[in-house]
Structures are given as structure tokens and as C-alpha cells.
Amino acid sequence: MSWQAYVDEHLMCDIDGQGQQLAASAIVGHDGSVWAQSSSFPQLKPEEITGIMKDFDEPGHLAPTGLHLGGTKYMVIQGEAGAVIRGKKGSGGITIKKTGQALVFGIYEEPVTPGQCNMVVERLGDYLLEQGL
């Protein structure tokens, strides 16, 4: 399966059969190279990936400044140290799951809930971890 198929079929999927889906998603290498993304995923800046990777290494690094992605600022909320970063902005937000080689991004807007976004992103991230990726 191609990386684009993982994005299209596992991240931009119909959530719970309700016709809802994430607003944007991507799979990005730890070096910031985009492996695959939805058409709506923002253009990443190198310093944004650097900050995200530093937060995985030093949990709490992004809390004072917020998480920036494509120039959008998210308030960092409780995640899982070294494994998951979660952010909130208005009625939407972001979940980032770290695997051995990649970062799995999911961005949501209402009516999709934070829990639904977490489930979709973390399910694929856990699968990739099981595959050694």
C-alpha cells in the first residue's frame, strides 16, 4: 500500500459511518519530508517540524509558545509524553502521533470531535509502530 493510500483510506476515512472526516491529514518523516498528505494539508515550515520533534524529545517544549503548523497556532493540550501531541484552536484541533520513522498528523474541525481525531490518528500510528515504521 502506498503512503498516499494510508492517508486517503485510513486518515481521510468516513468516521463512524456518519460521513464525517478529518479536515486534513499527512504522514511526514522525522526530517520533515512529506510522505503523503491530503490536498487540504498546510504547507509545513522546517522550524515547525523541528519544534514538534523537540517536544517529543522534551515534553512541554511547545506549551509556552504553542504548536505552529502551516503558520496556524494551536494551544498544546494534554497528550502522551514522547508519543502523542494534541493541540486546540477554536472548535478544531490537531493530533500528532510519533512512530519510529514518521509523524502522523490529523487536523479536525467540528462536528468531528477531538476523541474521533485521536482515534483515527493513533490507530494508524499504532499500526505503523507494529510494522516497525
From Swiss-Prot:
Q: Which InterPro entries does the UniProt record give? A: PFN, PFN_euk, PFN_sf, Profilin_CS
Q: How is it modified after translation?
A: Phosphorylated by MAP kinases.
Name assigned to this protein = Profilin-1
**Residues bearing PTM Phosphothreonine:** T113
**What cystine linkages occur within this chain?**
C13-C117
Function, in words: Binds to actin and affects the structure of the cytoskeleton. At high concentrations, profilin prevents the polymerization of actin, whereas it enhances it at low concentrations.
Tell me which UniProt keywords the record has, alphabetically. Actin-binding, Allergen, Cytoplasm, Cytoskeleton, Disulfide bond, Phosphoprotein
Source organism per entry reads Corylus avellana (European hazel)
